[in-house]
Every structure is written in C-alpha cells, then in structure tokens.
From Swiss-Prot:
Statement: the UniProt record of this protein carries the keyword Transport: yes
GO cellular component: vacuolar membrane
Gene Ontology MF annotations: monoatomic cation transmembrane transporter activity
Protein's gene: MTP9
All ranges on the Vacuolar side of the membrane: 136-140, 204-221, 279-284
Organism: Arabidopsis thaliana
Name of this protein: Metal tolerance protein 9
Family: Belongs to the cation diffusion facilitator (CDF) transporter (TC 2.A.4) family. SLC30A subfamily.
Function field: Involved in sequestration of excess metal in the cytoplasm into vacuoles to maintain metal homeostasis.
Topology relative to the membrane: Multi-pass membrane protein
Length: 402
C-alpha cells in the first residue's frame, strides 16, 4: 500500500475518514489500523498517571469545571482504546480474550439459578412475616412495604418464567430466540407495581383526610420492629450477593432487593415515629414508599422500552465494531455501513462491506461468514448480519417502512 493510500469508511449511520498512513510509522505492506498510532498525549491527565486532582493542564484551564471535562474526555478515550485492544485480540486469535469455557459457563449458570432460588425463598418467608407485622401493627407504611414484598413474589415468578422460557428454544416458532421475553416480563411486572402503588397512595390519602391513625401496643411494636429490621438485613445481604453476577435477571433481583432495603427502612422508621410522635407520619411514609416505587419502576419501564424499539448503540461501540471490521481482512476495500441497535437486552449488528468486483464467490462468502462469527462473539451482540457488495456509490438499499 502506498504511503498516502488509505481505505475509506462511510455510511449513513456511521462515518469515519481515516488519515493517510505514514511511511515512517507503518511498513508499506501494512493494511491494518495500528494501535500504536492511537495514544494519549503526554500532557493528558491519564497519561501522566494523575487521574484525580489538578494536573499540568490546570495552568491552561481557568475553572475546575473545564478541567473536569478534559479529565472525563481522556477517560473516555482510554476506555475506547481498551475496546480497540479487545477487538485487536479477536482479530489476532479468533476469539474473545478471557472468554469463559463451556464448563465455566455451566458452573456460572448453576450459581445464577441458585441465586434466583435463594431470592425467591427469602421473598416468600419475608412476605409471610411482614403480613403478620401488618396485621398486628395496622401501619400503612408497613402495609405498603408488605405489598412491595408481594410484588417481589410476582416479579420472581415473572423473571423465573422468562429465564426458563429462554433456556428452552424453539427454532420453528421463535427463529431468533426468546430474549425479548425478558424485557417484556419486566415491563409487565413494573406495570403491576405502579398500579398497587397507586392504591396505597389513595388509601393513605383517605386516612390523612379522615385523620384516622393506627395504634399499637408495646408488644405489637416490638414484633413489628423485629420483623422489619430482620427483613431489611436479609434483603441487604441478598442485594450484595446478587450484585456479584452479570446476568441481567439476577441483577434485576439485586435491584429489587435494594428497593426493599429502602422501603423497609422507611416503613420501619415512619411506623415507629408515628407511635412516638404524630400519627400522620405513618400514612405520609406510606405515600413516600408508593411514590418511590412508582418512579423507580417507571424508569425501569423506559429502559426496557428503549431496548425493544431498536435504539442505536453509542458511538464508542460503533467505533469498536468499525475497528474490528476494518482489520478483519485485507480484501475489504470499503465499509459502507456499520449499524447496531437494540432488540431486547443485546444488540443486532448490520454491516455492509465492499469487496473486489472480481473476487470469487466462495472467497467472498468465507470473508463475510468469518466476520459474522467474530461479531457474534462479542458479549453485547446477539446476532450479526454481514452484507457484501462490490461498490458503495448506490443509495441505501433498505428503507424503514412507516
């Protein structure tokens, strides 16, 4: 390749123009993008080894806000370079570095199922205990927390059902898999939680208007405090345990346990304060718990809706894909399109590459198929589609139907 020659990348979704390759930095026969040309400047906060505090750039920056933005920019660049290194490893070895073996995946799946079973068993036991505390205390805040535990059981069933459904594929009825069942199940569960939260708000408001507070004896108060405090501790430990996993369903349990820690703490505090000081603290606490539940799961619904409607991947991920594609094979003359979008919890990737017009079919097929296999090895990618063309001056061949 000549010293000033470079291959072009363009497309409606992602455009990149590479700089000419310098003869002094790269051998004439090199067609790959070299990571040696991508390095942080010596004056950057990260390259100087000082990630926090003031750096030598501070003399040029008048405000801490500007310095913070520069530091965040270099951190983002460092993360991008780490992604390029990962793509380079895939191109050199043919597989993802550090990818777990089949035996390790089986052990991980077994431990994830154990985490789900432990969470479901704990939710059932704590729900029964909190029902008793609700009956004895008649506290709206405790009742709101108990309803949240009931929803934990419902969510556990939904998440278990979706996880079990995804483990039993049916290539005839569901040719692209059942991964979409997970966000759909979470959306259904969140909708139920929001509905019950609204009922708690209405009942608590009725108590505030009627000025009818609950009363409990010292024995009932001790039972209520013991049950709610124990439930909070158990949920906190389960949250730490489930957060150690990367599986989306187990992490959804971790999020649910965190919500319970907050709602149990608020419910316990407001119930005790209502007994010691003012009766209206209890229904007010119940309203706070319900509002928190509704707002939290509303955000969860939005996140899962975005994952189902085909939202584009961030530019950094598209840049990683482009780097991987460009260094895949010497015969790739142009990258016409790099597109990645959500369709569930993972990305679908569409790539258009340009190969020589006179290339034999079997050679072009092998280049495209091996590239597809590399893309599908990425943990973020569920499926990849590689389209092969011999020119890139045409208009887009696929249009979205409205």
């Amino acid at each position: 390749m000549a010293a000033t020659e470079h291959r072009g990348l363009s497309g409606g979704d992602y455009n990149v123009d590479l700089l000419p390759i310098d003869q002094d930095d790269s051998p004439p026969s090199s067609w790959r993008l070299s990571l040696d040309t991508f390095r942080l400047p010596s004056s950057s906060p990260l390259s100087s080894g000082r990630h926090n505090g003031r750096t030598r750039l501070s003399r040029y920056l008048r405000t801490p806000k500007k310095e913070r933005k520069v530091s965040e920019y270099y951190k983002q660049q460092e993360k991008l370079l780490e992604g390029f290194n990962e793509m380079e490893t895939i191109n050199e070895t043919g597989f993802v570095s550090g990818a777990p073996t089949e035996e390790e995946l089986k052990k991980l799946a077994k431990s994830e199922r154990l985490a789900v079973h432990i969470s479901n068993a704990a939710n059932l036991v704590l729900f029964v205990a909190k029902v008793y505390a609700s009956v004895e205390s008649r506290s709206m805040a405790v009742i709101a927390s108990t309803l949240d535990s009931l929803l934990d059981l419902l969510s556990g069933f939904i998440l278990w059902f979706t996880a079990n459904a995804m483990r039993t594929p049916n290539n005839f009825r569901y040719p692209i898999g059942k991964r979409r069942m997970q966000p759909v199940g979470i959306i259904v569960f969140a909708s139920v939680m929001a509905t019950l939260g609204l009922q708690v708000i209405l009942e608590s408001t009725r108590l505030l208007v009627s000025k009818n507070g609950s009363h409990m004896s010292s024995t009932e108060e001790k039972w209520m405090i013991g049950i709610m405090a124990s439930a909070t501790v158990v949920k906190f430990l389960l949250m730490l345990y489930c957060r150690s996993f990367q599986n989306e369903i187990v992490r959804a349990y971790a999020q649910d346990h965190l919500f319970d820690v907050i709602t149990n703490s608020v419910g316990l505090a407001t119930a005790v304060l209502a007994v010691k000081f003012y009766w209206w603290i209890d229904p007010s606490g119940a309203i706070l718990i319900a509002l928190y539940t509704i707002s939290t799961w509303a955000r969860t619904v939005l996140e899962n809706v975005h994952s189902l409607i085909g939202r584009s991947a961030p530019p950094d991920f598209l840049a990683k894909l482009t780097f991987l594609i460009w260094n895949h094979h010497e015969k790739i003359k142009h990258i016409d399109t790099v597109r990645a979008y959500t369709f569930g919890s993972h990305y679908f990737v569409e790539v258009d590459i340009v190969l020589p017009e006179d290339m034999r079919l079997h050679e072009a097929h092998n280049i495209g198929e091996t590239l597809q296999e590399k893309l599908e090895q990425l943990s973020e990618v569920e499926r990849a589609f590689v389209h092969i063309d011999f020119e890139f001056t045409h208009r887009p061949e696929h249009k979205c139907k409205v």
